[in-house]
């Protein structure tokens, strides 16, 4: 039986650069660092970085796959400034209805996509129930 997410692992090309990103941008606490790995605690979530130097990374740019973090509206504005000050690659956001709340998409040094999002699953479901009549809801 599944009990929850155990950890999330990202393949990185430069461990030092990635450690700096995860500490400075995501405010993750570095727990251990090896020659080719690092582990972080991000508000109780175990984040693992493993160095893989010679793998293709172009497909990352072609996918919408990402990890999203919940933030407040006030924090989103501050976090955008942090991203800008640290020369983080900010992605153009997709067009969205204001009922879908606010988001800011960006990448880590290896192109993994992240999102700061001000909404909740409940917000999203309520919006979809109002506006997306083609959808089937099971709750």
Curated annotation (Swiss-Prot):
GO terms for biological process: response to antibiotic. Residues 4-119 form the VOC domain. Pfam families: Glyoxalase. PROSITE patterns: VOC. It comes from the Bacteria. HAMAP family: FosB. NCBIfam families: Fos_BSH, PRK04101.1. Belongs to the fosfomycin resistance protein family. FosB subfamily. This is Metallothiol transferase FosB 2. It comes from Bacillus anthracis.
């Amino acid at each position: 039986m599944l009990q929850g997410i155990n950890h999330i692992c990202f393949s990185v090309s430069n461990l030092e650069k990635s450690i700096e990103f995860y500490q400075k941008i995501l405010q993750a606490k570095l727990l251990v660092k090896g020659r080719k790995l690092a582990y972080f605690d991000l508000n109780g979530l175990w984040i693992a970085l493993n160095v893989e130097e010679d793998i293709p990374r172009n497909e990352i740019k072609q996918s919408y796959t990402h990890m999203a973090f919940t933030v407040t509206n006030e924090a989103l504005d501050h976090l955008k400034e942090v991203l800008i000050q640290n020369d983080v690659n900010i992605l153009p956001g997709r067009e969205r209805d204001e009922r879908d709340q606010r988001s800011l998409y960006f990448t880590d040094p290896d192109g993994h996509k992240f999102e700061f999002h001000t909404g909740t699953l409940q917000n999203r479901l309520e919006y979809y129930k109002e506006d997306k009549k083609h959808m089937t809801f099971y709750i």
